């Protein structure tokens, strides 16, 4: 496994003990791969409180920041895709940056963004 980017669906799946999410996560860590979580995805999934399973998942991950350059790139991608979800666009751009597939629960929202980015990054649905 070369890498993987988690969408909010993957984080929520981990919190709900989805075996497929945990199996892929454990496989990545065993291969020495740190999964990437865009910071905006963390904001979408984090609700405070202990969230022990999500916290456990995050200890093995890299959290990708969202800065001015990312904001501009996201805006351009949203324009090109004629859509408006900032989180989904940042997920796609993060996957492109890391040349990694995405683990998500809603591939349908990501595909137009991948297409607008003229890319073919793999999207794995859980």
Please report, for each region that a protein language model flagged, where it lies by residue.
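Acidic catalytic patch
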Residues: 43, 61-81, 93, 107
């Amino acid at each position: 496994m070369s890498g993987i980017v988690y969408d909010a669906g993957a984080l929520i799946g981990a919190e709900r003990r989805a075996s497929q999410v945990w199996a892929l996560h454990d496989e990545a860590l065993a291969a020495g791969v740190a999964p990437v979580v865009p910071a905006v995805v963390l904001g979408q999934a984090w609700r405070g409180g202990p969230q022990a399973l999500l916290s456990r998942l995050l200890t093995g991950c890299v959290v990708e920041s969202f800065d001015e350059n990312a904001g501009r790139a996201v805006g351009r991608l949203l324009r090109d895709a004629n859509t408006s979800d900032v989180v989904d666009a940042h997920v796609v751009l993060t996957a492109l940056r890391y040349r990694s597939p995405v683990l998500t629960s809603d591939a349908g929202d990501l595909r137009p963004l991948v297409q607008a980015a003229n890319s073919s990054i793999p999207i794995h649905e859980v």
